[in-house]
Each structure stands twice: as structure tokens, then as C-alpha cells.
Amino acid sequence: MEPGLCNRAYLLVGGLWTAISKALFAEFLATGLYVFFGVGSVLPWPVALPSVLQVAITFNLATATAVQISWKTSGAHANPAVTLAYLVGSHISLPRAVAYIAAQLAGATVGAALLYGVTPGGVRETLGVNVVHNSTSTGQAVAVELVLTLQLVLCVFASMDSRQTLGSPAAMIGTSVALGHLIGIYFTGCSMNPARSFGPAVIVGKFAVHWIFWVGPLTGAVLASLIYNFILFPDTKTVAQRLAILVGTTKVEKVVDLEPQKKESQTNSEDTEVSV
């Protein structure tokens, strides 16, 4: 192999690895901060139990912070349900999706562990683990989580899609998360994010109804992706192109506009990112 070709290959691999490692760290960090601050708001302090509005506002702000930190690096998923939705919509490859989810679960666990470590013993006993409340059945809990996550993922797609809006994704997605909490707290404590449920459950070892907070959100995310990408705003990718994107052998049209540009300054050009 020619030396010049070797150098180009080395630079390509090195640059690709740098981009991937930054994206994974961004997902790890964003999810960890989201869990630390969000779950921290539901802790049952004896002198002042948290109100539903307080929890909703805190999760709103935690979401906005996580999105603002990571959206230009990784796309600001910070949620396995969002990553699955992007995979179903052919906006991310399977290898990258698996790596993202692993980073998210690791970040959620570290965030929950940090919160557990700094919280007094009597307050941290349940660590905000999601459970079913108010005589809600498991079927009802799954349905609630499905609907809550469906509206969240639809908002994520619409907020991140540069074809639709130039507003702030952090503010809009944060508002969607707050909306979910204002309703969902009474049913399930409101997850909408399997990583948010996973981290605290790992630290305190409570998995009694943990499956609900995977089945509901992931199903809602898939439905939201199908609705947005195939009904509301369908694209023209062929089956072959979608399969190539799935395995990471082709370029992917960006739903997330990482570097927003004025549309009038572009002439027949499209933003793309390399799928991995």
C-alpha cells in the first residue's frame, strides 16, 4: 500500500474514532446529569416533600441542560427510546445506536450512584425508582408510558429537524418532558426514558416492575418514529439505502442540523454525516 494512502486511511480512522468517542462521552455525560438532577428532585425530604410542579420544572431544566450540552456532539439523545426512534427512522446505524445506549445506561448508573452517595440514608432509600401508583394496572402503566414517550419523541424529531424549525431544541424538548411529568407522575412516576429508570434501579436493586419502563417507552418511540418519518414528513430513502444506513456503510441524511446555516445561502446542497 502506498505511504500516502496509508496516511489518509490513518487520518480517516483517527478522525472517525475521535468523533465517535466524543459522541459517546456526550451521551454518557448528558444522561448522567439528567438522572442526577431529575431524580434528585423527587427525593422525599422529610421537611419538604417535592410537588408535582417542582419535579416537572426540574426535569424540564435537566433536559434542556442535557440537550444543550450534547446536541452539537451526539445529537442529544440521552435516552434509549430516542436512539431507537432514530434507528427506526434510518437516521443512525445499528452499531452507533448500540454504543449510544450503552453509554446512556452507564451515564445513568453513574449519575444515580453519585446522587446516592451524596444523599442521607433515610432519603435515598428508594432513590426515585419508578413504580406504579394509585392502583394503576401494569397494562395501564405501559399504555401511559407509551403515550408520554410518543409525544416526547415526536417533539424531539420536530425540534431537531432543521426543515421544520429554527427554534431552540433544548427549550422545546424540555417543555415536552415537563408536560409528560405533569401527567405521568400520578401513574408511574413518569419515566419516558429507560435509562432514567435503569440507573436508580441498579443502585438500589429494585426491579419489581422495571420492564414497564422499557416496554412502554420503547414501543411509544417506535410508533412516534413511524408516524414522523413515514407519515408526517416522509423521506425518499429506498429499502437498499435504509439497509446500508442500518449497517453503517453509507452516509445518512441529517435530521439534526448540527451547524444550522441560513437556508437562503445554500444552493442545492444537503447536510450529511457519516453513519457508523
From Swiss-Prot:
Keywords: Cytoplasmic vesicle, Glycoprotein, Membrane, Repeat, Transmembrane, Transmembrane helix, Transport
Any one biological process term the GO annotation gives: odontogenesis
Entry-listed glycosylation sites: 134
Gene Ontology CC terms, in alphabetical order: cytoplasmic vesicle membrane; transport vesicle membrane
Coiled coil ranges: none
Side Cytoplasmic, residues: 1-22, 71-75, 86-96, 160-165, 232-276
Any one GO molecular function term: ammonium channel activity
Keyword flag ATP-binding: no
Annotated protein name in UniProt: Aquaporin-6
Originating species: Rattus norvegicus (Rat)
Organism placement in taxonomy: Eukaryota, Metazoa, Chordata, Craniata, Vertebrata
Gene responsible for this protein: Aqp6
